[in-house]
């Protein structure tokens, strides 16, 4: 069997100190097969977004093993984690996190340039055209609709050609129709590249469209079903 894209083993994570210490993730163990899509749902405060931050190398765990793309994130220093994020993980958030003074093209190209890609602007142009924004390359975020800004964010996430795409409520700030377009783009990109998609959402129907649905509650997985059972 091929190595999983993601594997967590007995992961614990707490935030705060002393009496204010809160257990966010509790003894989590699961794996995600490469090239599949997983929708994670659960009430607010269940640990969904924190789990994504762990998978993206943006949050440290207290104990346990975190393996993503064959690399042990829990053993990496900050510089190694930054390099890992730059080459292996694409991240899309609910809020678009675009630089307001940069054009759409620059928002996608500059992170690539900083990671040493010489073809940064050409790659950025290709990705923006793939998400339907070839005609908006020189527009700034303020000149773009919410849906267009999220398309820029998706292009930016996909430009380094990551093996794993992580999305935290990517349609949360969008109307229903625009949200559907954004999700279709992400699923198409996943299939086209053979990437693994891990998606946190409040939308049960969206989670059910994934190959697998995981339900979290109070930092634990309480349900884990394949697509056939999720429908």
Residue ranges and their predicted role:
Residues 5-6, 11-216:
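ABC family nucleotide-binding domain
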């Amino acid at each position: 069997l091929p190595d999983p894209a993601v594997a967590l083993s007995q992961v614990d994570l707490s935030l705060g100190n002393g009496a204010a210490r809160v257990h966010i993730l509790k003894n989590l163990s699961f794996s995600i097969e490469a090239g599949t899509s997983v929708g994670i749902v659960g009430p607010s405060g269940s640990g969904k977004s924190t789990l994504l931050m762990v998978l993206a190398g943006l949050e440290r765990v207290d104990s346990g093993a975190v393996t993503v793309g064959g690399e042990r994130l829990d053993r990496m220093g900050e510089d190694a984690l930054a390099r890992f994020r730059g080459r292996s993980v694409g991240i899309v958030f609910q809020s678009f996190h675009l630089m307001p003074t940069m054009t759409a093209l620059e928002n996608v190209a500059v992170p690539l340039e900083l990671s040493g890609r010489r073809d940064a602007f050409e790659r950025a142009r290709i990705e923006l055209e793939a998400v339907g924004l070839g005609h908006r390359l020189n527009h700034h975020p303020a000149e773009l609709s919410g849906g267009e800004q999220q398309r820029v964010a998706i292009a930016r996430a996909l430009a380094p050609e990551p093996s794993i795409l992580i999305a935290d409520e990517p349609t949360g700030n969008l109307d229903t129709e625009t949200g559907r377009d954004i999700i279709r783009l992400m699923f198409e990109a996943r299939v086209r590249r053979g990437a693994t998609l891990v998606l946190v959402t409040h939308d049960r129907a969206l989670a059910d469209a994934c190959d697998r649905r995981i339900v979290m509650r109070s930092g634990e997985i309480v349900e884990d079903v394949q697509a056939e059972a999720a429908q």
